[in-house]
Structure formats: C-alpha cells, structure tokens
Amino acid sequence: MVLTDSEMEFIRKELGRDPNPLEYGMLDVMFSEHCSYKSSRPVLGLFPTEGEDVIIGPGDDAGVVEITDELALVIGIESHNHPSAIEPYGGAGTGIGGILRDIISMGAMPVALLDSLRFGYLEDQKSRYLFEHVVRGISDYGNRVGVPTVAGEVEFDENFQLNPLVNVMCAGLVPKNDIKRGIAPRPGDVFLLMGGRTGRDGIHGVTFASEELTSSSELEDRPAVQVGDPFTKKMVMEASFEIMDEIEVSGVKDLGGGGLTCCISELVAKCDNGARVSLEAIPLREEGMTPYEIMLSESQERMIFVMAPDDVEAAMEICRKYELPAAVIGEVTDTGRMIVESEGEVIADLPAKLLADPPVVEREARKPQLPEGQVEVKHPPLKDTLLKLISSPNIASKRWVYRQYDHEVQIRTVVKPGDDAAVLRVDGTTGVALTVDCNSIHTKLDPYGGGAASVGEAIRNVVSMGAWPVCIVDCLNFGNPEKPEVFWQFRECVRGMADMAETFSTPVISGNVSFYNETEGVTVNPSPVVGVAGKLSLDSIKTLDFKDEGEEIVVIGETGPELGASEYLRTVHGIVDGKPPETDLKAEFEAAKAVKEIIDGSGNKVTAVHDCSAGGIAVAVAEMAIKSGIGARIDPMKIPGRFRNIHEALFSESNGRYIMTVRGSARDILGGLDVPWAVIGTTGGRTLEFGDVALDISELDDAYHGVIEAYMST
C-alpha cells in the first residue's frame, strides 16, 4: 500500500468519509506513481507537445501524428522494469503485450517493435540470466503475434546489475479517419470486456512498480507479475480490428496497470462522465475471486470497447468467432461517479476524477556533487585501444539479440537491425525511420546535458538515414523521486530533453516515467530513453556501410577535448567520471539540417552516413568499414575541432557530429555549408589506417562480432 497520510487526508475530505477496503485498494493503485504520475506531471509540462502534424498528443494510450495524407503513425513506449527483474521472461513478454495493446486501442495495426535494454556486466552470472531470458521473452512474444522487432539498443553497466531496465517502443499505422480514443463520451453506452479472463495475476502490479526492489522481492512480489499469452493476444488483435471495422465504437482502451479500476475510471473521467460496473458479469479465470481482486487484477490480453447497446450482439458474434470470452460489464453514466456493484449491492462509490486525476506531489530537488573537469589518464597504444573498444559488449555487434527477432514479418522492413535506425515502408514512396537511444552515463554525470544529448543522438540516427524527425516519445527511468538528488536529476534531464526538442520544433507526443529503480541502496544510472520517428522518401535512404573504394570521408561537426564520461574511459580505463561533452543546441540543429539538405540535394553523391556517438570517430569509422568490408585511410589531424592528442580526436564523444562518404569532390557538394566540416580520409583497401596505425578489416571484424555470443555460451 502506498497511500500517504496526506493523501488519506485529501481522500477523506473529498469523500466526507473513510473509504471502505475495496475503495481503498482502488484509490491505492490510482494514486501510485505508476498510474498517477504525481511526482512527474509538473515537470513533464516542460515538453513541447504541439505541432502541425500532431493529431493526438500526451494523455492517451499512445501519440498520433500524420505521416501521409491518408495515414497516421501511432507510437508509444513503456517500461516493464520491475517485473523483468523478478521474472525476466514473463516480465519482458507482458511488456511487449502491453505496448501492443496501447497501439491497438488507438485503432492502429502494430508494424514495428523496438527495445531498449540495460543490464549488469556480462561477467556476472545473474546479469547473463536476466539478459538471456528478457531477450527470449521479447522474441517469443513478438514473433508469435507477428509484429517485427526492427531496432533497439543494449547497455551493460554495474548499476543495472540488480535492477535491469526493459523499455519497449511500438509503432503502428492507421487511416486518419479510423483513429480511436480512450474515452467514454456517451451516457447510455455500455462497456464490453473481451479477451483473456480475469485472474489473480498482477494484483498490485502498479504498486509494486512504484516501490524500490529489495532482496526479498523475487519471492514476495512474483504474484504482482502478470502472465502473458501471445496466442490469445493474436486473437484479441484480430477480433479488435474486426470490431472496430464493423461497429462504430465510441471508445477503446486496453487493461494494463491498475486493471479495470484504471481503465474504466480514465475512460469516463476524460468526458466528465461516470460508470456503473457489475462484477458478476466479468469472465473469471479462477473461482472465489473477491471484488478487490477482480477490480485490481492486471491479467493480460483484455480490452474494453465502449459502444451503443444495439451494437453488442454484433460485437459478441465477432468474439465468439475468435473463441474469446466477452461480456457487457457495465454502462456509462452522467453522474461523474464510478460505482461498483456485486449482486445488486453497491460496494464502491467514488468520484471518477478522484481516481483518474489525483493531486500532484511537490518534490524537493537538490543538486548533487557533479564532476567539473576532465579525467587525466595515460593513453595506451591506439591499436590496442580501438580493438578493446569495439570488442566491448556496449559497442560490439548485437546480432546475438536481433537474430532472435523476426524483423521481416509484415514485409515492411526496408533497413534491418544493425544500422543507425530501422526504416519501414509506409506506402509506395514514403518511409518512416525509427530508433531508440539513451546515454545513461552522460545523464548521470550531467543530467541536463545527458537528457539533451540523448534526444540529439536519437535525432542524428534518423537524420543519418535521410529522414527528418516528426515526433519524439520518451521512457524516463530514474531512482526514488522522494530523494532530492534523484528528483533534481529527473527535473534537469527533462529540461535538457525539452530544450533539444524545442530547438528541432519536434513534439513529444507520448511517454512513460518509471521511478523507484533502486535495489538495496543501488540506484540505476538515470536513463532517459528517447524514441524518434522520422519521415523520409524511400528513394533517399542512406545506410552506414561504405559503398565503394576511392570515396572521400567527411566529418560534419566539431570534436572537442571531451573524453569525460566516454565509453573509452569506461571500457579502457574502468572509469565512469569526468565532465560529459557540452551540448550546443544550435550546433546540433545546424549540423542535422546541413546533413539533411546534403542528402536531399546531392542526388546519389552521398553514399553513406553514420552518426558519431559512443566510442567517437574511431569507432564510427570502424563500424562503417566492418559492415562493408572496405578499408579506409584517416588523417586524425584533419578532424575539425579543438583536441590535444590523437586519443581525444578519435575517442571524444562530442555531440552534433556525422560521418559521411561522398562520390566525387566533397567540396563541390559541401562547399556552401555554414557548419564545420572537413575531409578526413578516403575509402579503400582492406585495412583501416589512422595515421601510421593500421588494422586489418578481418581483425576488426573478429573483435566486433561474437563478443556477446562468447559471454552467453559460458
């Protein structure tokens, strides 16, 4: 139970009485951090949420933007961190199920999944166990429901050892005239519950997600983890689309965190309406369930449709066709109250808005001590450094992960996992580039800069594909907001993200906040996972691999002496410290704008584009060479910027940088740009040369591939 003394005082004042046990349970889940966003709501208001392409912004199950004249892109992101720490296979699978239902409830067909995963170092046996079973849970669920997992990211750090992070993004497509909403606007309409039966799994799941984990959580909190069923989910998807095609439903919403209590109260509260719910009508999986268990159950694969009574039989016939339990469980009223009945007796009577719109909490924020300067280290030989970096699990190939996913199903995937972003076909000429990114180390050491840089990196990844960002979604993973230092991190991170989004005039249309990611006093690195969707023409797609020999290699953007918080320091020196790279909002925007203009205006003369992030320029060029099998000769001293030595030139993670290759003269193509750029080398041969240091492509390939496979075979 999480209701505080002040919350109970507020509730008593609103009701004029004490809540009964069922009402207390309903209020408890709705006042949880997971459902109410009571700590984060005042801060989330910093995000820009409006734009000319925005159809539905934050506040519904997912955000919606126009992507063509006829179609809308529906996109959302969710976390399933606590359940995945307790039961990794089931927790990850039900995370997939939840975000799929969010997209379906907007009327959209899910077309892509992306995942952002964080675990402890793979030397740790428990971390390997969690990693293996989370990936298997994602792949089994996604593959069985027929939705491709097309991109993602994985990070390993000791601060995720006890508390992994499992974030999942989903995108869907829907004709603009067929978009649905999570509302119940018409009194007299009824609630049709369909899908999986209601059982005892997941009770108090949202309360569990709003508390720190402990050493006993794995045993004590296992009942709070929901049980997924991908086969039923597939049937629910098919039946849902048939119902929405054939019946004029006035509202649709999935049952996720908070179960029936959350779903129905939110449906009616948005329209200042009320609800009357009859418990005996609800299809149950288990005998003897109490009203408390029924109203708080988070059993999976359930949907609520709001419709006129005359349409019920047609909907029931569709459910029978798919052999799915379904029942009318109540009706929309004009009272503004949520009333629960059992055997004709009223057992709960609460204002719907009290449930759906709890008061916010003003948290104390206090700045912790942060690094102000750079870390001085002795630099090892360049060749050894690069080989160690690209064989780090944080940089090495993630094919062990994505080869378990079906990324081809639905045949929309144009650019597959392993590039800067995935590209999906929307129609014959239009594509959408999708990515998720985060830099938890930068955010830990500079929350404002790390938040801004995470948005910047995600935007760079879609721009590198030839797209321009149309919307942002976010999943904000932090520790206990009751701790002033944690809440300061959160506030500053959101401020940085909002400033970068505002600079690009790109709206944040949906998101999720996951607090209390702490176990036994260890707080996860603050992790602002950013999803970006970009629109592009299918005939202008760029990929990161070198295409031919004799092409000029260009760097756009400046490199500074910024090894602080870098993957170089973490991997080579075992140091997580130092001031992260500066974030120049204007420079980030101008570089992205320049790259997009070059791609669009140069015909096919730009042959490859890659964003520069973890590991710096050396790693980015190595990845381009490894993927193509073509070598390159680089002169580090030609890199534009201010650096003191070759290691700073090659491994600094300065923001706002791109690497591209061009056919012909770079000066002819880039000469008019008003951003820093320089030709730093040419492609060719079977070695990668940085000055007088040369590495065979085969040696780089061996170091880059098979790293995670080797860990997971132990």
From Swiss-Prot:
Catalysed reaction, written as an equation: N(2)-formyl-N(1)-(5-phospho-beta-D-ribosyl)glycinamide + L-glutamine + ATP + H2O = 2-formamido-N(1)-(5-O-phospho-beta-D-ribosyl)acetamidine + L-glutamate + ADP + phosphate + H(+)
Protein name: Phosphoribosylformylglycinamidine synthase subunit PurL
Residues reported to bind substrate: 79-82, 101, 226, 298-300, 514
Active site positions, chain numbering: 34, 80
GO CC field: cytoplasm
Chain residues that bind ATP: 37, 474, 511
Pfam annotation, one family: AIRS_C
Organism placement in taxonomy: Archaea, Methanobacteriati, Methanobacteriota, Methanomada group, Methanobacteria
Keywords assigned: ATP-binding, Cytoplasm, Ligase, Magnesium, Metal-binding, Nucleotide-binding, Purine biosynthesis
HAMAP family the UniProt entry points to: PurL_2
Binding site for Mg(2+) 2: 102, 254
